[in-house]
Amino acid sequence: MKKSKHAVETKNLSISWGEVNVLDQLNFELNDGEKLAIVGPSGSGKSTILKILAGLILPTKGELRIFGEKQSYLRLDQNNPPDVRLVFQNPALLGSLTIEENVGFLLRKNKNLSKKLIHEIVCECLAEVGLFNVENKLPNELSGGMQKRVSFARALITDETLKSKTKPLLLFDEPTAGLDPIASTRIEDLINNTNDKANGSSIVVSHVLSTIERTSDKVLMLYGGKFRWAGSINEFKESNDPYVFQFRHGKLDGPMQPKDI
């Protein structure tokens, strides 16, 4: 695989639903090891970006490169897909499988791994997120918070069948949505710990200021299908840019109108 200092590169990335332009000629780069937050009001297309990066949908126009390789097919149609790991807003666990089977799903594809080794790897990943002795339980036997932790443990699993040996790209879709401040802090810690353990690059989509500020190095502001602002997290905290100021302070007055939000 071609080496690149960029985990992600997009050129004029666009997607339309019928006549509606959801994303309009987006250009950005994510360097190896960087942590990016994509922010903006609901319905601005943030989660759509993650779905494109994860290979769940294809852009209508433009170019996407992950770890230097052009992405032209859905992930399931690729012979040598990149190591992209998506943590959904909801845990997305398979209810009929045990926690060990959910977390170790990718490992079971590798016939060179024994059941004993898979068990050890899964338990190690569960321990990294503070879960012990839950591997034989079903998802509905765990609390919502514990299920969320399981989804983070799953993001620590490396698919050894991948031919590419790049560092992973971790995608977090609204990881703290609807959580109280204490629970949000715990999840933010999990995001940072998962990033450190996986030693990759990450993109977080969030509306929560503490999540944005604690889990990212730089920020992109998305509105109306276009990036309206880009800068470091420190610049985001201090910027008087009208889009950033309105988002940060929850103002009704500004370029993002309530009827659109």
Language-model segments: residues:
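Conserved ABC ATPase "signature" region
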Residues: 115-133
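H-loop/switch region of ABC-family ATPase nucleotide-binding domains
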Residues: 206-207
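Conserved ABC ATPase signature
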Residues: 138-142, 146
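Catalytic Walker B motif of ABC-type/P-loop ATPase nucleotide-binding domains
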Residues: 163-165, 170-173
